[in-house]
Amino acid sequence: DSMTIFDNVALPIRERTDDSPKQVEARVEELFQMMDLPGVGSKYPAQLSGGMKKRVGLARALALNPKIVFFDEPTTGLDVHKSNEMYRLFHHTQARVGYTAVIVSHDVPKIFKLSDHVALLAQGVIQGQLTPEEFQRSENPLIHEFVDTTMGPIYSSEREEAALNETA
């Protein structure tokens, strides 16, 4: 919280590259533009809304052009509108930057729309790594129960045991 937003996003570039100050500034400004964050460079985190903080976090994550970006519940704390904006931003930045996103989320409908592949982790075991369409048609009881929540709690012991025995 003691660094400006500019310095926060610039930090990995300064620490991991030999870029000149002008190059660092240009990269940070490019990221601010990509994230629709005009005029935030001189502000501090406490001065930003939750959605702006999420976009700053994405800007910093993309500062070094990573091949893979991990997101853990990336829309937690956002309203539906801001959550949708974040998912659109993920899609836009993936197309522009070309990274692979690994997203941990309980927002299943959004994940099905956004993802090329979906995996369910239950009791430390990946139950399936499938396309969203295959995932929704899966006969695996745990996946089926996860997709169709009308069947009851996801960890009913008989179904869980049966599913885990199938994968063993």
Model-predicted segments: where are they?
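H-loop/switch region of ABC-family ATPase nucleotide-binding domains
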Residues: S105-H106
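Conserved ABC ATPase signature
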Residues: Y44-L48, M52
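A short, surface-exposed alpha-helical micro-motif characterized by mixed small hydrophobic
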Residues: I111-K113
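Conserved ABC ATPase "signature" region
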Residues: K22-G39
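A short, proline-enriched helix->beta-strand linker immediately N-terminal to the Walker B motif
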Residues: A63-K67
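Catalytic Walker B motif of ABC-type/P-loop ATPase nucleotide-binding domains
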Residues: V69-D72
